[in-house]
Amino acid sequence: MDLRELTQHDVATMWSINEQGLPGTGQVSKQEMADLLNFSVLSLGVFREQELLGFVICLPPGTRYGSLNYAWFNQRFEAFMYVDRIAVAQQHRDQGIGSMLYEQVIASSDEQGVPVAAEVNSTPPNPGSMRFHERFRFKEVGELHHQEKSVMMLLRT
């Protein structure tokens, strides 16, 4: 498996993988996925030959991204690397791909001297994602309630 930066050529496959992770990943259109890639400070994919197996998109503070979760971090922290989404193709889960991606995110944030920001659904609950983030020493720093769901806001310093 190889890690590489994502490009606009990867958007259709990224979108498909993202759809497999709903509702945990949050639904976006292909155009919104392309926009996220343009906003990103870090966008990595894990590939086996030419097949995209999983990806992560991280945003810096201050972009035009309209997510309420992202805005929550923007209002409270000056510097961070926001994990907007991490997704692994259904048939490739439980193979360490998510961990491989997060290790790169953490290494990049450590190089920049900024914390990693993320959120996990609390309603409906996503216990697998919470355990995953706890393994990487994320701590809860708040909770945000939306109409149909709530999310725990996490930070890794």
Feature names for model-found ranges:
Residues 1-14:
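A short beta-loop-alpha structural element at the N-terminal edge
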Residues 84-93, 122-123:
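A short, internal acetyl-CoA/4′-phosphopantetheine-binding micro-motif in the GNAT/acyltransferase core
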Residues 42-60:
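Conserved beta-hairpin
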Residues 143-157:
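C-terminal "cap" of GNAT-fold acetyltransferases
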